């Protein structure tokens, strides 16, 4: 049976017509293929201890000396819509076995903070966390590597070095090059070791020369789809496939401001979610701010006509649109009626006129070209 590789998956996508030939993507696939082959052909070092002695060592908190040079990884950076996440996923899906992890960088840092809380009072907690990751994986794939929080910045210098020292290979995507991470941040000097570690253990590739596939998809599509019938649902599914790079198979529950938020899909910094979840349930403007930072594209499903009995829902919808607009979030909507018929209430006519104007602008090519403001 022929093995699945990044190259074979890339060629399959071209043959099926789901992606077009792109020289920059082809170069990235070539680099990912090299990493893949080196990982497949490398033999991890044998553990120093096993059985009873290993369990006793762990019980007493002793760590093995597992330092070795990892297979050199890849840090792909560039604007949205360049296919970075799709390329990384080709690589990740090609890797056999379970000793691999693919995480949104925000989720990775949430786990690190949870582990640190549990390890309060321990000496060298970052070393322990690195040990735990090494016990689970040999490859980390980070989507959207971005640092804006001073606490994260202070941790990453030591943590990245510890992960690389244990032979973990990193493949990451980001909107900015390593040298621009945490630019102008407080005490940035303490973050510089993280940048040095990334550049020492990863090739850095700019993918900006390629086609902006997300922009092309959005500019060629209707972004306000109505009415709510089978054809609209099929169009939304087709757009999700193009924007997120896969079918809506996972519907994780997010934690936003310490409260659960049910989704219809999360992938490639794209969120699928219902109007009920965001505007009927009691969500606050702070929730919309958090979502606008996390996702560059939101697909909002099943927006009803907002009558005078839905003024609270309409007010939340206005707040949601305002936050998405300010951070250049791309919004795709399925609705009961066309855009200018969606509000039929009384009290918010003035406010909704401004909202409609923004929604109209958010469908323009000029708006769609704007860079998402995640920070």
Swiss-Prot record:
Keyword Disulfide bond belongs to the record: no
Originating species: Escherichia coli (strain K12)
Protein name per the record: Cell division protein ZapE
Subunit structure as annotated in this protein's UniProt entry: Interacts with FtsZ.
Protein location: Cytoplasm
Main subcellular location: cytoplasm
Biological processes per GO annotation: cell division
Domain of life of the organism encoding this protein: Bacteria
Binding of ATP, residues: 78-85
Protein family per UniProt: Belongs to the AFG1 ATPase family. ZapE subfamily.
Cellular component GO terms held in the UniProt record: cell division site; cytoplasm
Keyword presence, Cell cycle: yes
One family name in Pfam for this protein: AFG1_ATPase
UniProt xrefs under Gene3D superfamilies: P-loop containing nucleotide triphosphate hydrolases
Sorted UniProt keywords: ATP-binding, Cell cycle, Cell division, Cytoplasm, Hydrolase, Nucleotide-binding
Higher taxonomy: Bacteria, Pseudomonadati, Pseudomonadota, Gammaproteobacteria, Enterobacterales
């Amino acid at each position: 049976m022929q093995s699945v590789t990044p190259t074979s998956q890339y060629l399959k996508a071209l043959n099926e017509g789901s992606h077009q030939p792109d020289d920059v993507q082809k170069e990235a696939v070539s680099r990912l293929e090299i990493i893949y082959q080196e990982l497949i052909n490398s033999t991890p070092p044998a553990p120093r201890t096993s059985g009873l002695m290993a369990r006793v060592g762990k019980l007493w908190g002793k760590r093995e000396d597992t330092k070795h040079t990892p297979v050199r990884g890849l840090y792909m950076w560039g604007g949205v819509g360049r296919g970075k996440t799709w390329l990384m996923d080709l690589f990740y899906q090609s890797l056999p076995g379970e000793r691999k992890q693919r995480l949104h960088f925000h989720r990775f840092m949430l786990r690190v903070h949870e582990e640190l809380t549990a390890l309060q009072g321990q000496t060298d907690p970052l070393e322990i966390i690195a040990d735990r990751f090494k016990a689970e994986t040999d490859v980390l794939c980070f989507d959207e590597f971005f640092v804006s929080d001073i606490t994260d910045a202070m941790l990453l210098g030591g943590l990245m070095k510890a992960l690389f020292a244990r032979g973990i290979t990193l493949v990451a995507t980001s909107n900015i090059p390593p040298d621009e991470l945490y630019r102008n941040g407080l005490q940035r000097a303490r973050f510089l070791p993280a940048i040095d570690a990334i550049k020492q253990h990863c090739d850095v590739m700019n993918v900006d020369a390629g086609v902006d596939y997300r922009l092309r998809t959005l500019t060629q599509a209707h972004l306000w789809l109505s009415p709510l019938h089978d054809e609209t649902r099929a169009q939304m599914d087709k757009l999700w496939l193009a924007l997120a790079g896969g079918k809506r198979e996972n519907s994780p529950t997010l934690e936003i401001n310490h409260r659960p938020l049910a989704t219809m899909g999360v992938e490639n910094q794209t969120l699928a979610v219902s109007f009920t979840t965001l505007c009927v349930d009691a969500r606050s403007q702070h929730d919309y701010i958090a979502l606008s930072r996390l996702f560059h594209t939101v697909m909002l499903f099943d927006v009803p006509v907002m009558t005078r009995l839905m003024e609270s829902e309409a007010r939340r919808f206005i707040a949601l649109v305002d936050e998405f607009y300010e951070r250049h979030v791309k919004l795709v909507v399925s609705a009961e009626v066309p855009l200018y018929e969606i509000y039929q209430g009384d009290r918010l006519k003035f406010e909704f006129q401004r909202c409609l104007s923004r929604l109209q602008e958010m469908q323009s090519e000029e708006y769609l070209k704007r860079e998402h403001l995640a920070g």
